Amino acid sequence: MAVVHKIGGDGAGTQFVPCWSCKGPVAGRALFCHTCGAIQPPGVTDHFTRLGMAPGFDLDDEKLEKQYLGFQRVLHPDRFAAKPAKERAIAESQAVALNEAYGVLDDPLKRATYLLQMKGVISEVAEDKTVSDPALLMEAMEKREALSDAESADAIETLMANEAASAIQCLSDISRAFADDDLEAANRAVLRLKYSRKLLEEARLKRAALES
């Protein structure tokens, strides 16, 4: 087991772990050893921290992409082509962790679900369970029936426009709920967004089938 040293008199501060290569101290979130320069394995950290973003639902999309692309360049396989097999494997694991983090944070639904998990709320979205909210289930059923009854591309387009507006409203509701630290409201809005996305995808498929 790696020994963790924490710098900071009050228990806060930077955590250091031994470098796998030279055993020198390495900041827990550092990509490379400060002493020997060896790339370090991805530590146990949240997706926001991994990408250098402050935890929260409202993110600067341009900054998120810039951070991601910057780390991607640092972890590009060409940079490690001449390194030993272990370093190449570690670089690959870092890239996998980076891609996973970006995949979550770049998607508002996944980001909101992940943020709820960080706050101790396991949404039905995360567990892919049937939603237990009767009102939401009824609303979803009614919308799917309306889609089933739609017999023209124009009717489907109208339904999609209405649902796209609902999805945008869900994003606004999620943002406000997290700002107010109302996790119950955030979870409800996340579930509504899940159903909106599912309906929109089904509508796109039906429209494509009609037009083919």
Q: Residue spans of the language-model regions?
A:
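C-terminal accessory/regulatory regions appended to core domains
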Residues: M1-S212
